[in-house]
Structure formats: structure tokens, C-alpha cells
């Protein structure tokens, strides 16, 4: 049994390194002043995406299609060195009962109704990962979004862009809500080759084996499955790919690189949680 497991893990490692060479290699990111001026990666762009998301129905949808191409590979020059680090010195983090060693507040943007009866209650996650951002970063972004801008792009649609979620029709996107959750930091990881949550920047490859960093074969297997199955513009560098207008960051973080959204984390499955609040995008962003 042990021999079989060893062989399986060896195969997983071999496959991963093959895929790493494919996915973490040669690509040009969309670093422009406006997403409407993105360079089109025609080599990687799936033109079926244009047909699936026509701009007559989905505003700025071509930028989403370009995002899929531009995040297919992760490169060193795409690394952002100001990721949110989960450390005690980070004063922007909200800790439960204001105790640094307690749970911290995160937010997920979801259309799932399973949280609705759990406000104020402790529960355990289902057998799936939950992609989240650290509160109040989403709120800090969407509050300054002006009424003039909202007439062109609705708040829910802009949040989809910010978080690298596909364009959605109004009947679907209007079912989404912001769920704020208390979670222990030990149950969080960053979806990058190095899942450590205390870092300000990500790695494009798995760290070399050392006495300080241990990347398990189980995590490598999870990462490989994401590479093969993920159909969102996943940067693999610890931040969401914002395919919306970069000018929206002008009031919040003018120096932010184009297409860099929010730092993203994942709550591992079977983690104990507590729902703090559930809000519509409009109420959350007041």
C-alpha cells in the first residue's frame, strides 16, 4: 500500500512539473492604462469566448476573454509585491473581538443560499474550498464607486470584474451577495505555488525543499487539478485578475498595477466558521 502511494505521488509530481513548464512560462500580461487598450494575446485567446460573451450583452467582455489568455501562464514580472499578509502587524485586518490571535474577517461573493440561515452561528464548511478576500478590502474598493460609474457598470457586475469572475446576466448576478465570515488563519491558504499566508509576494514555482517550507504532495496535486480544471482568469500569484476599468482604482490606489485586483485566499474544506453578515452589493458598498 505504501509503495503504491509513493508511486502515485511520484507520478503526480512528474505531471506537475510538466504542467508547470507549460503554464508558468511565456505569456504577456495586459499592463496598460485602460483595459480597452489591452494587447490581445491571439496565440492563447479562446475566440469562442467572444461568442459566449458578446459585448452587446456583457459590457467590456472582451477584456474578460483577454484575461483568460493573459493568466494562462504566470511570470516573474507579473508578481505583485504588496499582497495582503495575514500577520499581527497588519492593522487593516479585522480580528474577532479585537483579539489578534482570534479569527479574522473575510468576505466571499456568492450566489449560494446555504449561508442564509447561519448568521451568527458556528458551522463547518462543506467538502469544498471557499475563495475569499480579507475584509474590508472589497468594501474599501466598492464604496468610492460613483453613481455616474454605476449607470454604466452595476456594482455587482463590477465586483465580478474585480474578482476575476466571468460576465453574468443580471438575473444571475443579482442573486449574488457578500457574505462576511470569521475564520481561523490556520484554515486559510493562498492559491499559489507557495500557499503561505504571511508573505507579501508569491512564487511562480514551488519553493525548493528546505527545513522552513514544506509543500505537501497533496497540495501539489490540488494545484495541478486547479491548473487543469480552472476556467476563470486565475493569476496563481495571490491576487485576483481585475478585468474592469483600471481608472476605478484612481481614488483608492493610483499606483496599483493594471489588472491587479484584491489579494485572494482560500478557506480549506471542513474548516469551522461563523457567518458575520450577508449583504447585497448595493448595501455593502454604501
Located regions from the model:
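ADP-ribose/NAD+-binding catalytic cleft of ART/PARP-like enzymes
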Residues: 34-133
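Extracellular-facing segments of soluble proteins and assemblies that are Gly/Ser/Thr-biased and enriched
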Residues: 94-199
Amino acid at each position: 500500500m505504501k509503495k503504491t502511494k509513493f508511486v502515485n505521488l511520484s507520478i503526480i509530481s512528474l505531471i506537475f512539473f510538466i504542467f508547470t513548464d507549460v503554464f508558468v512560462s511565456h505569456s504577456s500580461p495586459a499592463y496598460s492604462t485602460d483595459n480597452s487598450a489591452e494587447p490581445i494575446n491571439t496565440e492563447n485567446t479562446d475566440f469562442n469566448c467572444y461568442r459566449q460573451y458578446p459585448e452587446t450583452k456583457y459590457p467590456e467582455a472582451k477584456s474578460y476573454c483577454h484575461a483568460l489568455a493573459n493568466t494562462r501562464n504566470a511570470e516573474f514580472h507579473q508578481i505583485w509585491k504588496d499582497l495582503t499578509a495575514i500577520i499581527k502587524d497588519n492593522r487593516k485586518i479585522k480580528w474577532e473581538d479585537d483579539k489578534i490571535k482570534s479569527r479574522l474577517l473575510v468576505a466571499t461573493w456568492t450566489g449560494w443560499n446555504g449561508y442564509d440561515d447561519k448568521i451568527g452561528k458556528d458551522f463547518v464548511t462543506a467538502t469544498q474550498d471557499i475563495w475569499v478576500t480579507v475584509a474590508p478590502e472589497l468594501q474599501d474598493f466598492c464604496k468610492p464607486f460613483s453613481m455616474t460609474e454605476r449607470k454604466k457598470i452595476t456594482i455587482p457586475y463590477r465586483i465580478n470584474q474585480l474578482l476575476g469572475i466571468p460576465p453574468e446576466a443580471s438575473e444571475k448576478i443579482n442573486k449574488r451577495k457578500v457574505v462576511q465570515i470569521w475564520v481561523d488563519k490556520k484554515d486559510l491558504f493562498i492559491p499559489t505555488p507557495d500557499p503561505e499566508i504571511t508573505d507579501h509576494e508569491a512564487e511562480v514555482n514551488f519553493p525548493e525543499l528546505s527545513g522552513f517550507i514544506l509543500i505537501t504532495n497533496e497540495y501539489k496535486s490540488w494545484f495541478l487539478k486547479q491548473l487543469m480544471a480552472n476556467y476563470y482568469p486565475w493569476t496563481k500569484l495571490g491576487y485576483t485578475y481585475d478585468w474592469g476599468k483600471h481608472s476605478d482604482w484612481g481614488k483608492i490606489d493610483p499606483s496599483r498595477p493594471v489588472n491587479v485586483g484584491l489579494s485572494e485566499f482560500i478557506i480549506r474544506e471542513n474548516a469551522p466558521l461563523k457567518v458575520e453578515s450577508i449583504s447585497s452589493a448595493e448595501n455593502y458598498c454604501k
